[in-house]
Amino acid sequence: MSTSFACTTCTVAFNNAESQKIHWKSDWHHYNLKRKVASLPPLSAEVFAGKILSIQKQNEEVQKKAEFYQNCEVCNKKFYSEGAYSSHMASKKHRDNLSKFQRNSRIKKLQSEDASSIASSTLSMGEPVVDSEIEEEEDLASQLTSRAISLSNLSLHGRESEPSKTELATSIPQSNEASKSHLFTQEPTPEEIEAELARRSSQRLSPRDCLFCAASFSSFDTCKKHMKASHSLYIPEREYLVDEPSLFDYLAEKISIGFTCLTCNREFKSLEAVRAHMQQKGHTSIAYDTEDEQLELSDFYDFTTSYPDYAVKQDETVVEEDGSSGEGDWEDVSDDSDNSSLDSLEMGRVPIADEYELHLPSGNRVGHRSLSRYFRQNLHSSSTAVGDGASIHQNVARRAMSGNARAYRQAVETSIAGVRDGRKNYSASHIKSFQDQRRREEFANKMGIKNNTKKHFRDALLQ
């Protein structure tokens, strides 16, 4: 073979010039030229073809991923990425929705089978069913369907609960006669409600059981210390609490029977569920912020000691008790004694002149806090309160201190007398910058206090 037609870049020879020209236009030759520029050895035709096939395969995979589309009928979602679709299929939410979807499908299948069996039933004599009897059977089928749906939504206080297979099996009668004699209603019966209450009452927590976990203790005080140390339980208005055991009994009943969270009042399906919620969310405190929440616990508190007239009423009670000891202890007092002396009880009372001023027995007057901006004003004394001689003396002194004399006195008081003007200006600017820095720090502290978004702060030492 003649070697006059060869490609030194790819190290191949050709029979004629046409083959050589076609080779020079090929991708293989162009690729080897780039490798030659990069000081790399050339590739053979087989290796280059393998690289082309691998690149085409990768492009097909990328195109396949770009055209990916899947629809989840259970969750009613669309996915355009294989990773997102696989993650969704493995998620707990999808599994829960799938179980609900399958359960609803079984219920619908049972309902359709029962309705079809009742509609196609015939009399025992083999005669066709009359139109009126067909309508009666259809009404019965609809009632059975509503009963199955009501069992799926049966709850004590509006909470949803899932029916078991045995309940669905027993709710559908086996014979036509039993179906006619046993008609159901959509609302739960009082017997079912009492049974549910009895079941929950059997799980009621005792005073020695922790409200937030499964721990149990030998005494109520030990249990209370555990809840305070381990779960940060805080009892609001402890100084006014008069019936602490009853309060904890009510909280235990709210958690173990009502399955309700103490903080957010959210209802759950079981005791374990509400405990897990309170531990995960940190809802281990008693809700006592709104007026309704305070009224809910008002039976366990007594706030009479916080009333302003509580001390006066206590004194009156003591006086009445002392006076009712016996009729022989009474003495006649003349009318003059009433005018000459005041009752000690009346002197202890503080008369209120109006709603903005309080007159104390000592003669002082206390103003209302809403008028504090006026009480803090430092007003100059009026000239009428000073005699004529004093006013003349003040005018003479004011004239004497006017102008340069006043400036010199101010300089002496600020210890800058005899200092050059440049030094004075520097001192004044330094004082001004210090005042500006102080204002900035005060503003920063004020904004920090104002923007503190922590809603609740209760010191454990103040309980």
UniProtKB/Swiss-Prot annotation:
Comp. bias regions, Acidic residues: 317-338
Comp. bias regions, Polar residues: 113-124, 167-188
Compartment(s): Cytoplasm
UniProt cross-references to Gene3D superfamilies, sorted A to Z: Classic Zinc Finger
Zinc finger (C2H2-type): 5-30, 70-94, 208-231, 259-283
GO BP terms, alphabetized: nucleocytoplasmic transport; ribosomal large subunit biogenesis
Modified residues (Phosphoserine): 150, 155
Main location (coarse class): cytoplasm
Source superkingdom: Eukaryota
Stated family: Belongs to the REI1 family.
Protein name as it appears in the record: Cytoplasmic 60S subunit biogenesis factor SPCC550.15c
Organism (species): Schizosaccharomyces pombe (strain 972 / ATCC 24843)
